[in-house]
UniProtKB/Swiss-Prot annotation:
PANTHER family the UniProt entry points to: INDOLE-3-GLYCEROL-PHOSPHATE SYNTHASE, TRYPTOPHAN BIOSYNTHESIS PROTEIN
InterPro entries for this protein: Aldolase_TIM, Indole-3-glycerol_P_synth, Indole-3-glycerol_P_synth_dom, Indole-3-GlycerolPSynthase_CS, RibuloseP-bd_barrel
Similarity-based family: Belongs to the TrpC family.
Pathway named in the protein's UniProt entry: Amino-acid biosynthesis; L-tryptophan biosynthesis; L-tryptophan from chorismate: step 4/5
Coiled coil (UniProt feature): none
Keywords noted in UniProt: Amino-acid biosynthesis, Aromatic amino acid biosynthesis, Decarboxylase, Lyase, Tryptophan biosynthesis
Protein name, entry field: Indole-3-glycerol phosphate synthase
GO biological process: L-tryptophan biosynthetic process
HAMAP family: IGPS_B
Enzyme class: lyase
E.C. number: 4.1.1.48
């Protein structure tokens, strides 16, 4: 685990402890069961792919640790609608505050503005967070293999499945991919960002995608800026992409989204 992930895990575990005290597990589980019906996340992606379209998971992200503030004019419902108009298949919404200036209410308000499935993009270290995600309206969670052991990864995946949610299992090297394929999750995210240097390279996706079985869906994450990047990933069988920063920086998000997908 990188030093960055260790620092993140430390503050996330503090956050989780505070959240559990403020809202006990039984209460958050009840809220999760009462939340709006789950929208099929993997199902929406599979439909886009079956129709021959690139499946875009469009990310609503205000800031990042490496780039600082990305979008000052930050209106999650408006951004969600722009992404939907531009042809996005799903949304990803950052809910981590210290590193990304995200918030739970961003997820809820974005989801309410559209009919797209939504990923809670956050660092998950406890099944409490899965119940939290469902209570906030999330349809999918993220499991980052670089930050969790196999037992916790399995617990998170099982907790998501119990709520009818999907999980993206994120990897960035061969060893993590091998571990991810042991989980009963259809979505395999390949992060092109090196978690040690924060540099991005599409070569990571090009190297790992051929090892993803045909019954799984490979997702290219990070470092995707142009239709040429999208086409490059398509050559290795990646038809699903997660894009945030490059679209968040555009004045006309809907137009930029449709242009990215014009391949």
């Amino acid at each position: 685990m990188t030093d960055i992930l260790k620092k993140i895990e430390a503050y996330k575990r503090d956050e989780i402890a505070v959240a559990k005290h403020a809202r006990p597990l039984g209460e958050i589980e009840a809220a999760a069961r009462a939340a709006p019906r789950v929208r099929p996340f993997a199902g929406a992606i599979a439909t886009s792919l079956a129709e021959g379209r690139t499946a875009l998971i469009a990310e609503i992200k205000k800031a990042s640790p490496s780039k600082g503030l990305i979008r000052a004019d930050f209106d999650p419902p408006a951004l969600a609608r722009a992404y939907q108009r531009g042809g996005a298949t799903c949304l990803s919404v950052l809910t981590d505050t210290p590193s990304f200036q995200g918030a739970p209410e961003f997820l809820g308000s974005a989801r309410a503005a559209v009919d797209l499935p939504v990923l809670r993009k956050d660092f998950m270290y406890d099944t409490y967070q899965v119940a939290e995600a469902r209570a906030w309206g999330a349809d999918c969670i993220l499991i980052i293999m670089a930050g969790v052991d196999d037992l916790l990864a399995r617990d998170l995946a099982d907790a998501a499945a119990a709520y009818g949610m999907d999980a993206i299992v994120e990897v960035h090297d061969d060893a993590e991919l091998e571990r991810a394929l042991d989980l009963p999750c259809r979505l395999i995210g390949i992060n092109n960002r090196n978690l040690r240097t924060f540099e991005t390279s599409l070569e990571t996706s090009e190297r790992l995608a051929p090892r993803v079985p045909k019954d799984r869906i490979a997702i290219g994450e990070s470092g995707i800026f142009t239709p040429q990047d999208v086409a490059r990933l398509a050559k290795v069988g990646i038809g699903t992409i997660l894009v945030g920063e490059s679209l968040m920086r555009q004045e006309d998000v809907a137009s930029a989204t449709s242009q990215l997908l014009a391949v």
